[in-house]
Design a protein with these regions (language model features):
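Short alpha-helical elements
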Residues: 1-205
C-alpha cells in the first residue's frame, strides 16, 4: 500500500500536463514523429510517456504505463522502441531544430557561451568512465548557450576521463550542424569559453 501511495504521489507531482500542454505537443512536436500505420498506440500518449521518463529520470521499466497509455497490454518496451527509433532516425532532432528556428527571435545571440558539463554516472551505461579528478564515473557533454543561458545545442556525450578539448573540432562541428538546421549561424558572433578550451587547434578552427 505504501509503495502504491508513493507512486501515486510521484505521478501527480510530475503530471506531464503541468510541463507541456497537449495543444503545444500536438502543434510543435507530433508533426515530426510518426508510427507505423499498424500501430494501435496513440502518438500523443506515447510522447507524453517519453517526456515523463525524461522529466523524472526514472528507468524505462518504472514508467507508470497505465497512467499514460489507454491501450491495454502496452509495456515499457514498446515505449522505449518508439523513443529509440525517433532518436536514431533524427525525428527528435528535427523537432528541436524547428522549435529553435521558429522562436529564434527570443534568443540573445549577441554572445554565446561554450562549456563542458560532467554528469555523475551510477549505473553501467554508454559513454561513461572513471574521472580521476572528480573521483567518480561520469559522462561529459559540451553545451552552447545564448547570452541568457538558453541552451542552443549540445554535443554527443563522451566518457568522463576525457577533458573538454577531446576531439573538440568534431564535437563543435556537431553543434554547428545542428544550428544550421535551425537556421542559426555563429558567423561574426562573439563566443565566450573558459581556459579549458584554449588551444591552438580550436583557435585556428
Amino acid at each position: 500500500m505504501l509503495c502504491k501511495f508513493v507512486m501515486k504521489e510521484k505521478i501527480q507531482n510530475h503530471n506531464i500536463t503541468k510541463m507541456i500542454e497537449d495543444k503545444i505537443l500536438i502543434k510543435e512536436i507530433l508533426p515530426y514523429l510518426s508510427m507505423s500505420k499498424d500501430s494501435e498506440l496513440d502518438l500523443l500518449e506515447t510522447v507524453k510517456a517519453c517526456f515523463y521518463r525524461l522529466k523524472t529520470g526514472c528507468q524505462w521499466r518504472e514508467i507508470p504505463v497505465k497512467q499514460f497509455i489507454s491501450r491495454a497490454g502496452t509495456t515499457w518496451n514498446t515505449l522505449y522502441y518508439h523513443f529509440n527509433k525517433w532518436c536514431k532516425n533524427g525525428s527528435w532532432l528535427k523537432a528541436y531544430a524547428a522549435l529553435l528556428k521558429k522562436y529564434q527571435r527570443y534568443l540573445d545571440m549577441s554572445c554565446v557561451n561554450l562549456d563542458g558539463s560532467h554528469s555523475k554516472v551510477f549505473t553501467a551505461c554508454q559513454s561513461a568512465a572513471y574521472n580521476g579528478r572528480k573521483r567518480y564515473r561520469s559522462t561529459n557533454l559540451l553545451f552552447l548557450v545564448d547570452n541568457q543561458g538558453v541552451i542552443l545545442c549540445c554535443s554527443m556525450p563522451v566518457s568522463g576521463e576525457h577533458h573538454d578539448l577531446y576531439e573538440i573540432t568534431t564535437h563543435f562541428d556537431e553543434i554547428l550542424e545542428m544550428l544550421e538546421q535551425a537556421g542559426l549561424s555563429l558567423k561574426y558572433i562573439f563566443m565566450n569559453a573558459d581556459a579549458g578550451f584554449d588551444s591552438t587547434e580550436f583557435r585556428t578552427y
